[in-house]
Every structure is written in structure tokens, then in C-alpha cells.
């Protein structure tokens, strides 16, 4: 799922979801139920162009889920979302049957929704640790990050 939006602005939200279902040969799909999953049920007949940034992110997640991937890459996926939408986004993601690799700089989200942290430097893994282990050592995610950056200096 890209950081920027790659949606078709000239389609209505419901039509875009229907198109995606058709492209993936998904039958007997309840578009209203799908839109409700991402809190967009009230926007079914609105053009994608008129959605806010956070609404577009949620729509992108839905379209990604409809691909039934085994692995997805997310680049700052909650940009533009309010706090409630962020929580709902991560909880929806947790319900899925795929692995997510997420790029984020939001330590709070890492703390609450992630299981493992990898820090990249110059295209390689500079450090990796489970969130549980970081906390077991009495550190916050931010402290772990700053310690690793300082060591890599």
C-alpha cells in the first residue's frame, strides 16, 4: 500500500470497490459491509476525489485487503487519520491473515500495534528486536531507536 494515493478520483467509492471485486473475480460481495469495515459506509455514493486523506488511506487498505495478499508493505499508512481511525485501522489489519511490513516514525503506534522493530541504516538492518523484549529491558521504543542510532552514529 503506497504512501500516496493511487485511487481513481473520477469513480464513486462504492463503484471503485465493486470494480476491485470484479477484477479479483470476487462474487457475492456485500459492498456495504466492506465499506463499513473501513468506516466509509456513508461515502458509498461520493466520488473518491471528495474524500479526505484519511478516508483515502482507509479505502486503499480495503482495496489492498481485497487482493487477499500474504504480505503487504505499508509506508506511513495512517498519515492523515484521526486517532480513532488509526486505532480502527490497526485493529482491522490485525484481523487479516497476512504479514505486514510497515514503515513508520510513530513510536506510539509501534508501541501499541507492532510485534517487532527493525531499524534500517544505509539499506541494511542495523538493529532488530521484539517490542516485548524492548519493554522487558525497561526501554521505550523511542529509547531503543535513539540508542541504536547513537551506536550506528
Question: Model-found features: residue ranges?
Answer:
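Q-loop/switch helix immediately C-terminal to the Walker
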Residues: 10-23
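Conserved ABC ATPase "signature" region
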Residues: 18, 28-43
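Conserved ABC ATPase signature
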Residues: 47-51
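Catalytic Walker B motif of ABC-type/P-loop ATPase nucleotide-binding domains
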Residues: 72-75
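Conserved H-loop
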Residues: 98-103
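A short, surface-exposed alpha-helical micro-motif characterized by mixed small hydrophobic
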Residues: 110-112
